[in-house]
UniProtKB/Swiss-Prot annotation:
Transmembrane segments: 1-10, 34-55, 70-90, 135-155, 183-203, 245-265, 277-297, 304-324
Subunit relationships: The cytochrome bc1 complex contains 11 subunits: 3 respiratory subunits (MT-CYB, CYC1 and UQCRFS1), 2 core proteins (UQCRC1 and UQCRC2) and 6 low-molecular weight proteins (UQCRH/QCR6, UQCRB/QCR7, UQCRQ/QCR8, UQCR10/QCR9, UQCR11/QCR10 and a cleavage product of UQCRFS1). This cytochrome bc1 complex then forms a dimer.
Membrane topology designation: Multi-pass membrane protein
Binding locations of heme b b562: 40, 139
Residues that hold a ubiquinone according to the record: 158
Protein name: Cytochrome b
Location in the cell: Mitochondrion inner membrane
GO BP, sorted A to Z: mitochondrial electron transport, ubiquinol to cytochrome c
Other comment: Heme 1 (or BL or b562) is low-potential and absorbs at about 562 nm, and heme 2 (or BH or b566) is high-potential and absorbs at about 566 nm.
A Pfam family assignment: Cytochrome_B
Gene3D superfamilies: Cytochrome Bc1 Complex, Chain C (1.20.810.10)
Lineage: Eukaryota, Metazoa, Chordata, Craniata, Vertebrata
Essential cofactor(s): heme b
Amino acid sequence: QILTGLFLAMHYTSDTMTAFSSVTHICRDVNYGWLIRYLHANGASMFFICLFLHVGRGLYYGSYMFLETWNIGVLLLFAVMATAFMGYVLPWGQMSFWGATVITNLLSAIPYIGSDLVEWIWGGFSVDKATLTRFFAFHFILPFIIAALAGVHLLFLHETGSNNPSGLCSDADKIPFHPYYTIKDILGVLLLILVLTSLVLFSPDLLGDPDNYTPVNPLNTPPHIKPEWYFLFAYAILRSIPNKLGGVLALVLSILVLAFIPFLHTSKQRSMMFRPFSQCLFWILVADLLTLTWIGGQPVEHPFIIIGQLASILYFLLILVLMPITSLFENNLLKW
């Protein structure tokens, strides 16, 4: 991602007049520019798929008991989401502009300082030149901060050693990383590259929005403003609350709730490997997130509104109430 981004930055201009045409120029005139651009855009999607799988794996096997590692992971998730959001603004298409307008506007819900804060971030009275330039600057610097944080993430993991599916100590079963884990990891990497190259070479625009191929027009709002697929679940939660501040809080909490999970762990066992009821709830949570992702991409009308509201309630209910109670029930089941 950093490499493709670097090569894109060599040809990109962060000025409102030329940003859109510079991206077009990259795709048409730069040698393999189309490849670099689509590797970067779809690489972000693959990145998020990996992140979601990684977080899900951590939830399932109780890896969140490594507090420092887990909290840095949550911080990393926020940083990656911020980076992806700012990157989406750079091509300066319709969805870039209106996405930036809608999401930055959410900050105006903050009491007292809200509207000043939004204008400060915009660098004016609307999303304009100053906004695009600073988003480019932040989009360039953040991945390096993320890389550094990932190093710290690993540092704290190595303090404890990694977890395993059983949730038990595996010190006695340790084997050399190379060749065993290296060869195992190469398989996953190859599968990942296969999916990425298939996406890039066969249907590069599958996950994108056609509205972003229309240059910015501040006077014309697209019929359905929606983010990239990996933000749709959070967007659905945001939209399911009629109050602006409430929606913003729910949006932040939808990710921040991950930080509370270690304190909601009531089970005597670390992993869900031997806890069938918790497993069931975990997969309901996955289904619920897929439902939210679907709802986030739908227009705000019946029956999508009520489905989104129910899915949002279920999301928080599962994590904050049902899973901890089920864990206690399972403890009693085993007479612990």
